[in-house]
Amino acid sequence: MADFRFLQDPASEKWLIMAPKRAKRPDQAKGQEPLCPFEDHLEEEIYTLNEAKVVKNKYPFAPIHEIVIHSDDHHKNFDELPANKTEDVFKVFRQRFLAHKDKGQVYIFHNQGKRGGESLPHPHTQIAVVPEEVKLEIPVLNPRNVVRKELKFHYIFCPNTSQWPDEVWIAPHRGGRMFGQATDEEIQELSFAVSRLIQIFDLRHGEEFPFNFYIYPGGDWYLRLIPRLKTLGGFEIGTNVYINTQDPLETFEFIKEHFDNPDFEKITSQHTASYERSV
């Protein structure tokens, strides 16, 4: 049997991926202290930028499925890596996007923590190139009538229709482009923004919190950061109608207050968040 198959439901016309071999991939996020889980991948490096490395995913669910290993450090992720190393990771994202943009839909996504879908503890991001005929149901950028925090090259906002508590979007001021067209200055600012958001959310939740982010694969690109402390309930799973128990405006005010100069004591004493229960 092939490693994966794309299947379309004839009734709903929605797509799914059948990939039973992925159930056999190692799961080292359960607590044991392993050797580097990517040790046996390094002889097959596809691309390298300083410590950031790209290797093939041994358990793919797409024709092209790569892993970006962030650095040589087994534990430090975006919130703890030096700025230059985080910037290198995002430059690798851009390079791989450009390498694959004519082969399909380049979907860059990151899983952090067990509840965020992470199975290997060494910080890494995945890149899956999905065939064009497979329709990806991803929200499009619609920044109208939203309150923004302005950066030099980007703006940060929390959509009024956020599906997840503390959901945050980052988008460039210059629209109409794909992620591969981001400039070095934009990459530098984007990598800093992601790192800072993770830092203050770590404090807000009192622990290293689980999250996902992805980069929109089409034009008018954006990065969407989704904390994963909330558990989906049966209503949301069955109807695909999400119940958000956190006011996006409160999330935005929290970001606006602490993004530039985080007040660590105030975050931990006054701005903690708790919404782990299902609804």
Predicted feature descriptions by range:
Residues 180-188:
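Gly/Pro-rich active-site loop or hairpin
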Residues 188, 193-196:
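Internal alpha/beta scaffold segment
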Residues 1-122, 128-179, 198-279:
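Active-site microenvironments that recognize anionic phosphate/pyrophosphate groups
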